[in-house]
Amino acid sequence: MVKILLENEPYLVARIDNQSLNPYMFGERYGFGIEAQNEQNSKIKKVIEHYEKKVASGKVPIRESKSLFIKDTKETPDSLKFLQYLYDKGNEENLKLYIAVNLKQNKDVFYQAVMSNKKKLVKKILSYNPKCIDYTNSEGHNVLHIALKNKAKADAEMIEILLQCKPKLITEKNKENLTPLMFGEKYGFSEVLSKKEIDKIKAILKDYERDAIRYDSYLPDPPNEKMVDFEDELLGNNLGGVNGTEL
């Protein structure tokens, strides 16, 4: 019966109930079929795990029961819950598959992990797919802009994790031409964090911004274009050869 259900609706393995349990977690907690024999329970587990791998590999898309960019931060989308479940279960193969395949197709899952302040999960994601740190959305926000949104739970430690991974996040601008610090100052940082935590975040952002400015000041000046053109002319580079002769 379990196999029949999952053949018709494979994504059900990732569906989360009101107790924040997916089918496998529910079975583990409540003993699967109490009337079923151990051998039968073992078969059920294998069937569920088979379909979990299908979801993790991207062969079966997760149908969200909630909007991914949630307005109420108490709600978490099913795709992120499933990712957290794979992490908690310690299934490295499925976790790696899910991160490699699904996060390329659905960047919002990574953003939501950051906004939900899932630090261990974010570190794991970045260890398997470092390119996630370079993601930007349609508004030009990088992951640091997103971490500072007014509903985000990302604390100072999460901000530090992101900046340690890619310090240049601090100077990248969105389509409003705002760096993350400017974005936070304009829109008020997160309203779900304490003032003390926001002050910590501001201090970290300012430190990284100061370091970025200091680093830029030590870089050599760009070459003078006119001087480069003059040198090229002397060397015959503008003609594609040596001493003005074509090759």
Curated annotation (Swiss-Prot):
Which keywords has UniProt assigned to this entry? ANK repeat, Repeat
**Matching InterPro entries, A to Z?**
Ankyrin_rpt (IPR002110), Ankyrin_rpt-contain_sf (IPR036770)
- ANK repeat locations: 105-135, 139-171
Q: Does the keyword 4Fe-4S apply?
A: no
- Entry protein name: Putative ankyrin repeat protein RBE_1110
* Organism of derivation: Rickettsia bellii (strain RML369-C)
Taxonomic path: Bacteria, Pseudomonadati, Pseudomonadota, Alphaproteobacteria, Rickettsiales
